[in-house]
Amino acid sequence: MNFSKSLLLIAFGGAIGSIFRYLLQYWFGNVLGYSLPWGTLTANLLGSFLIGVVYAISDRFPLFDPQWKFLLASGFCGGFTTFSTFSYETFQMLKSGHYILFLGYICLSVVGGIGFAFAGVWMIKNF
């Protein structure tokens, strides 16, 4: 595959994923408030599920065009999920003295992300 084409697919997918994450964070912030970063958590969990789906489809169907992986996994999921925002929000919880929220958010994000990725793979492999 052409390297330049791969970069364009990743950039396009990343731009779309970033826009979706922003809209999700904006919506959750307006509906539920900002006491817990629901938008970031939801984006990271959904992105983990989607990347599991993409890689499972790629494994299950050998003719799956690798370009889709660049667009969807590296691009969309890479732009949609955000470890840096998760890290900053977690740091802010710690700095503000919200220790239980801090630990809960870390556990929910990490264990939930792995669980959602597993669920995405499991769903494709079993249906």
UniProtKB/Swiss-Prot annotation:
HAMAP family: FluC. Belongs to the fluoride channel Fluc/FEX (TC 1.A.43) family. InterPro entries: FluC. NCBIfam families: crcB. This is Fluoride-specific ion channel FluC. Fluoride-specific ion channel. Important for reducing fluoride concentration in the cell, thus reducing its toxicity. It holds the Pfam family CRCB. It is a multi-pass membrane protein. Keywords: Cell inner membrane, Cell membrane, Ion channel, Ion transport, Membrane, Metal-binding, Sodium, Transmembrane, Transmembrane helix, Transport. It catalyses: fluoride(in) = fluoride(out). GO terms for molecular function: fluoride channel activity; metal ion binding. Na(+) binds at residues 78, 81. Na(+) is not transported, but it plays an essential structural role and its presence is essential for fluoride channel function. It is found in: Cell inner membrane. One of its GO terms (biological process) is cellular detoxification of fluoride. The chain crosses the membrane at residues 8-28, 37-57, 68-88, 100-120. It comes from Leptospira interrogans serogroup Icterohaemorrhagiae serovar copenhageni (strain Fiocruz L1-130). One of its GO terms (cellular component) is plasma membrane.
